[in-house]
Curated annotation (Swiss-Prot):
The record marks S360 as: Important for catalytic activity. It catalyses: oxamate + H2O = oxalate + NH4(+). The active site is at T342. It comes from Klebsiella pneumoniae subsp. pneumoniae (strain ATCC 700721 / MGH 78578). Keywords: Hydrolase, Protease, Zymogen. InterPro entries: GGT-like_enzyme, GGT_lsub_C, GGT_ssub, Ntn_hydrolases_N. This is Oxamate amidohydrolase proenzyme. Its EC number is 3.5.1.126.
């Protein structure tokens, strides 16, 4: 799959084709890219339920045809009952169960804030009920189970089947659903109908919020109704990198947007255009190690930062990191942050308004906890907190956890505008770097830049080792060379879902829209 889809009026890219089609339908009805993205976000919460959902977080990067981008941080903070004392006697926060479900789910608040921006930009609005219609229909009528959902359910079954509400919601006769079977989510359909009738804000302030809070209390989750009511999405200023090819943007802390920009800022000072595969992988991997070190030293709740993160992206900060890379030897590597189940999606409309968006519940099926009578599986993003009170990521009520999520965008010197991203924990910034380097610097066609074999340093969902993982389609000589350089290479399948689900849309100066999706996903680039 090496040919991009090209359209003239609108383009939507998602890792599930039904979400792409939901966005496209809104574009055809005259909706904005933002409204189309809300429709896609709701749809994919239903059709890719192991990856994301209403019980997760979201981040937006909205790029208008002219002017600065607008970022939305729709991530939730730790609940008011999530104290260090509440976890006394434990070495770390559990990855599953009610104690893992300790942060407010923010993604729906991001939909609210994004639609407010859409109205401000366009002066019009489609009804929320229209934006949620496809999602409601898929939840009621059933979705075709993907191989990805079936595999995620089966592989994590023993650690999840006893979590509250999991078996009743996600299993069929006590087992993982079969790929290609029809899977219904009636409780989630009811929740979506409430949001359509009462408004999206009812998730935090209304009858739905009260239902959620009652379920949380019954399950022993450390989130209260007051925590839901206090939550609002925020609009932080995005991080900016001045690259030789143009201006790049990503999200500020608590995300690892710094990592994605730092990798490209470091490699911008290396000779990437003519690098062969082994050199490309080696240099980006070495830049990744240095960017991860910045992340691990600094990134936390933005109210607790000890540095101006934007200053870490200046030429003065990046040049020494580039100079420290040895083309003949791999540097030591200490390990990554871990997995992340996520979806990235992009939409560009006829006006040139572009959206880069990411939505996640962290691990596969998040905490595994499904709130009673809602069909909502709650995220376990709070597992990223530390129980060490001196740690940068120490747990505290009202504190935001670290996020791997980071949607990217670029406005290039030649007039192209690009939104791009990927799911995949530690792999997200690496995949962004691979895509940008191949397409922008090395002249590889957009779709081929995503389809070509990829690599991953560290861990992502489905993987627990910290090795340098390569897809098996890399040439044997490339794999051998990377081992000679000192990398701990592990070869995976030819097309491995561990590499994430990437996507991109490019708006060309002539107005044509080019979309590419990942053959590792169930996605589509849908345009008209």
């Amino acid at each position: 799959m090496h040919s991009s889809n090209v359209s003239t009026h609108g383009m939507a890219v998602a890792p599930h084709h039904l979400a792409s089609q939901s966005a496209l339908a809104i574009l055809r009805e005259g909706g904005s890219a933002i409204e189309a993205m809300v429709a896609a976000a709701a749809a994919i919460a239903v059709v890719y339920p192991h990856m994301n959902g209403l019980g997760g977080d979201g981040f937006w990067l909205i790029v208008p045809p002219e002017g600065d981008p607008i970022a939305i941080d729709a991530s939730g903070a730790a609940g008011s009952l999530a104290t260090l004392e509440a976890y006394a006697g434990q070495r770390h926060i559990p990855n599953r169960g009610p104690q893992a479900a300790l942060t407010v789910a923010g993604t729906v608040s991001g939909w609210v804030e994004a639609l407010r921006i859409s109205r401000d930009l366009t002066g019009r609005a489609l009804p929320v009920a229209r934006l949620l219609a496809d999602a409601i229909g898929y939840a009621e009528d059933g979705i075709p189970v993907t191989a990805s959902q079936a595999h995620a359910t089966a592989s994590k079954l023993e650690e999840l089947r006893h979590q509250p509400g999991f078996s009743e919601t996600w299993l069929v006769a006590g087992e993982a659903p079969r790929p290609g079977s029809r899977f219904r989510q009636p409780a989630l359909a009811g929740t979506l109908r409430m949001l359509a009738s009462d408004g999206l804000d009812s998730f935090y302030r209304g009858p739905l919020a009260e239902r959620l809070a009652q379920g949380m209390a019954a399950l022993g989750m450390p989130i209260t109704l007051g925590d839901l009511q206090a939550h609002r999405a925020r609009r932080p200023g995005p991080l900016t990198l001045q690259h030789q090819q143009g201006t790049l943007w990503n999200l500020a802390p608590p995300t690892q947007g710094l990592v994605s920009l730092a990798i490209l800022g470091i490699t911008d000072r290396l000779k990437m255009a003519d690098a062969d595969d082994a050199q490309t992988v080696h240099r980006i991997v070495e830049a990744t190690k240095r960017a991860f070190a910045l992340r691990d030293a600094h990134i936390t709740d933005p109210r607790h930062l000890d540095v101006d993160v934007q200053q870490l992206l200046t030429p003065e900060a990046l040049q020494p990191l580039a100079d420290s890379i040895d083309d003949a030897s791999a540097s030591p590597w200490g390990g990554g942050k871990g997995p992340g189940d996520t979806v990235w999606m992009g939409v560009v409309d006829n006006s040139g308004l572009a959206v880069s968006f990411i939505q996640s519940i962290y691990h596969e099926f998040g905490s595994g906890v499904v709130l009673p009578d809602t069909g909502i599986v709650w995220q376990n993003r709070g597992a990223a907190f530390s129980l060490d009170p001196q740690h940068l990521l120490a747990l505290a009520p009202g504190k935001q956890p670290f996020h791997t999520l980071n949607p990217a965008a670029a406005r290039l010197n030649d007039g192209r505008v690009m939104v791009y991203g990927s799911m995949g924990g530690d792999g997200q910034p690496q995949t962004q770097a691979a895509l940008f380097t191949r397409y922008i610097l090395q002249g590889v066609p957009l779709q081929e830049s995503i389809s070509r074999p990829r690599w991953l340093l560290g861990r992502t969902w489905g993987q627990s080792s910290d090795s340098l993982k390569l897809e098996g389609r890399f040439a044997p000589a490339c794999i051998a060379r990377l081992r000679e350089l000192g990398h701990d290479v592990e070869v995976l399948a030819d097309f491995s879902e561990a590499m994430g689900h990437a996507g991109a849309i490019v708006r060309h100066p002539n107005g044509l829209l080019e979309g590419a999706t990942d053959p590792r996903s169930n996605g589509a680039a849908a345009g008209y």
